[in-house]
Amino acid sequence: VEWTDGERTAILTLWKKINVEEIGAQAMGRLLIVYPWTHRHFASFGNLSTPSAIMSNDKVAKHGATVMGGLDKAIKNMDDIKNAYRDLSVMHSEKLHVDPDNFRLLSECITLCVAAKFGPKEFNADVHEAWYKFLMAVTSALARQYH
């Protein structure tokens, strides 16, 4: 992926403002509520039977924070995201057997939560476009092992 200076600045500026615990918990909760078939990957998380159970589940929040924290690896390796995520791609493909489309679904949930948090002044069209491109690069890197 090639980044313009504007895209790189938009992504890095936004990333500095993101609270990974807050956005991670919200995004993971949304994923599990909106796409209930994803529950099968999180059987060890306990009660995922209702939206309120999901949103108050500490394991959901912790995993969401872990996922968001993992984006820091992509931030620090924006020019080589695929290689930075090689091991995670192998793990999700060969050990966890995660449907690679779930990465895209989670990216959408993350984007919704970020947009809701920062609003249209900070998360304007240009920032949204750069952020989307960034998350699609991460999604592609995570799905790499499946190809």
Curated annotation (Swiss-Prot):
Keywords: Heme, Iron, Metal-binding, Oxygen transport, Transport. One of its GO terms (biological process) is hydrogen peroxide catabolic process. Residues 2-147 form the Globin domain. CDD domains: Hb-beta-like. PROSITE patterns: GLOBIN (PS01033). Involved in oxygen transport from gills to the various peripheral tissues. This is Hemoglobin anodic subunit beta. Heterotetramer of two alpha chains and two beta chains. It comes from Gymnothorax unicolor (Brown moray). Belongs to the globin family. This fish has two hemoglobins: cathodic and anodic. Cathodic Hb has high oxygen affinity, low cooperativity and displays a small reverse Bohr effect. Anodic Hb has low oxygen affinity and cooperativity and displays a normal Bohr effect. The keyword Cytoplasm does not apply. Red blood cells. InterPro entries: Globin (IPR000971), Globin-like_sf (IPR009050), Globin/Proto (IPR012292), Hemoglobin_b (IPR002337), Hemoglobin_oxygen_transport (IPR050056).
